[in-house]
């Protein structure tokens, strides 16, 4: 599957931008942005999105029922394995959708399923604190400051 990359200087949310692209009949792709002004987290929480961090959403059609919990866990394991090569500290998976280092959140995943024109799409949103972190006690960690 070859995915086109849609890069933006700023969006409200990469997941919302993916939904907008799907509604323009774009079937698959990757959305990236330098910043998000209204990033989304689990259960309606806001993902604080500062410049220098990674904000990405991957979207594509899916044909059958999928277990989102298993997909989220698999994605967390993949990202954890990538970060293990960069970060000298233990990386922990905090279910349902976070990675933590030194008990501080550095990565979150938000997956959504939408239906458009009778097609089922999966959107995988990933946020990683690389350069900066929010000034929220639980999240005060970025990879560059480890």
Regions found by a protein language model. Name each.
Residues 132-140:
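Cytochrome P450 core scaffold surrounding the K-helix E-X-X-R motif
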Residues 26-28, 117-120:
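Short coil/turn connectors at secondary-structure junctions
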Residues 1-86, 107:
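N-terminal lobe of the biotin/lipoate ligase/transferase fold
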Residues 144-146:
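Conserved small/polar residues in nucleotide/adenosyl-binding loops
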Residues 82-117, 127:
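Acidic (Asp/Glu) carboxylate-rich active-site/surface patches
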């Amino acid at each position: 599957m070859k995915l086109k990359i849609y890069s933006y200087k700023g969006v409200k949310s990469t997941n919302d931008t993916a939904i907008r692209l799907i509604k323009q009949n774009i079937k698959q792709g990757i959305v990236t942005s330098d910043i998000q002004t209204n990033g989304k987290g689990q259960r309606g929480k806001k993902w604080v999105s500062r410049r220098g961090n990674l904000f990405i959403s991957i979207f594509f059609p899916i044909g059958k029922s999928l277990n989102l919990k298993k997909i989220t866990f698999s994605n967390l394991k993949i990202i954890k394995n990538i970060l293990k090569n960069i970060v000298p500290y233990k990386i922990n998976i905090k279910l349902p959708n976070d990675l933590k280092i030194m008990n501080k959140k550095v990565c979150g995943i938000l997956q959504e399923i939408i239906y458009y024109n009778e097609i089922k799409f999966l959107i995988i949103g990933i946020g990683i604190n690389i350069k900066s972190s929010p000034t929220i006690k639980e999240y005060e960690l970025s990879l560059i400051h480890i």
